Amino acid sequence: MNGRDMMPACARIAAADPAMADRMWNTTTDDDGRDLVDERMRGKGRMLCAACPMRLDCISRALVNGWKDKAVYGGLEYASRWTLARLIARDLHIADGGLHRIPRSRVRDWLAEHPDWAERMRRDGRDYWRRAKRRQRSRREYATDDPLFLPTEPVPKGLVQGSLF
């Protein structure tokens, strides 16, 4: 086995076609200077990351270094990395933003010890947003619907509704 076989797919693609690698794992800039994301190519990049043997290394490096950009590392975008970082920090009993204080190998070992981390991450992200929405709804002021009692005049005695025709 030579060194080329050990090279991850993202590095091989970046060496052959850097523009394609940017579209798969990073952003491209249009003429106006805005960052563009090619979702179709990102999907292909995520598929390559899912099969990559170095995926846990990429994820642990991104989590410990705290990269806050629009790039994809190990198949995860920033929001997913943030959710995973919270999950790992809670499990390791450190502050949410404290992953940069621990060795990268410890984060990688945690990922290797918990092969169900992707499902736990999805569940944790879903639960987080559920709690946030409940908190938001609990703070909302609701208008109470008071019954509408309009002032009325008493009916005169002896008056009966007549026929219309």
Residue ranges with predicted function:
Residues 88-165:
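Short flanking/linker segments adjacent to small metal-binding domains or redox-active Cys/His motifs
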Residues 8, 71, 162:
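A broad, low-specificity signal marking well-ordered, structured residues that form hydrophobic/aromatic
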Residues 1-9, 14-53, 64-68:
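Immediate flanking context of iron-sulfur cluster ligation sites
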Residues 5, 10-13, 74-109:
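Short Fe-S-cluster ligation motifs
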Residues 35, 74, 124-128:
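Helix-centric, low-specificity signal for extended rod-like, repetitive segments
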Residues 44, 55-73, 78-82:
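Iron-sulfur (Fe-S) cluster-binding segments and ferredoxin-like electron-carrier domains
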